[in-house]
Amino acid sequence: MAKQKVWFADANAANWVESLVPKAKDLFYEAKLNECIEKGDSVAIKIHFGEWNRTRCLRPELVAAIVEEVKACGGRPFVCDTTTLTYHAYSSRFIGNLALETAARHGFTEASMGCPVVVADGFSGDDDVRVEVPTGVLLKEAYVAAAIAHADAMINLAHAKGHPVASFGGCIKNIGIGGQSKRGKYHEHLAHWGSPEDFLGWPARYPEKCLGLDCPFHKLCEDSCPRGAYHIDEKGHHFDAEKCWLCYSCQITCMFTGHECMVFTPDYFPYAQIAMADAAKGVMLTFEEGKVGHMAY
């Protein structure tokens, strides 16, 4: 694959006309992202909606600026994100209506964007398109959110962020995870990769570390599981693997509360990062060459 040119705009500004909004508009044309769009194209602008009451998401003005230029090129943009894989107290985008409420909380609405704001994988996160990835290192297929897969062009509008699996998230993570349906997220998190005896995605359990009912978060842990596979009593935690659908809610809840009774296996992370790149390739394969542009803040 040929090396791609990367443009950089300094965030420093001596006056208001040098702020990030006009710089983003200038960069849109300097990087020739306008050439991705033909008149009448349906254009997915893939962002991250953020999580409820958290501030690590793009400012709406930065997204609206790109929407305006896509429309100026004759495109028909829509701003989108997907539902999350996990169902737990720290996630506010597990289903479509909650995702849109979170988007509105952060200023991503049709009124502020000047275009529709949609959940690309549908209300339940199961609206997808299966895509073969022949060159994938680990994954040979991806399940791309339908609204993205059916778009004519895409602007991948990312921002730098931390991520518990990827460590660092940018443009690859924004579509490698954020461009997948729930089924795609299960797949790329390696929940069902390998033989049942060595699924890398299965949680590593250390029941001897569980405080049982003495843990102040034991009710939160139980409530985090949408399948009732996780139960805590005075003897500690009990896990029913047959009920588990590998949404990682128990692991993330336990880890985020500072405990390590349910964690990822040590060798999980490098493989998951490779799978994420394979999944991102799957998203790219749904578009014709030259129909995707990437921009990161």
Feature-to-residue mapping (PLM):
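Extended, low-polarity segments enriched in aliphatic/aromatic residues
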Residues: 2-62, 68-69, 73-80, 86-297
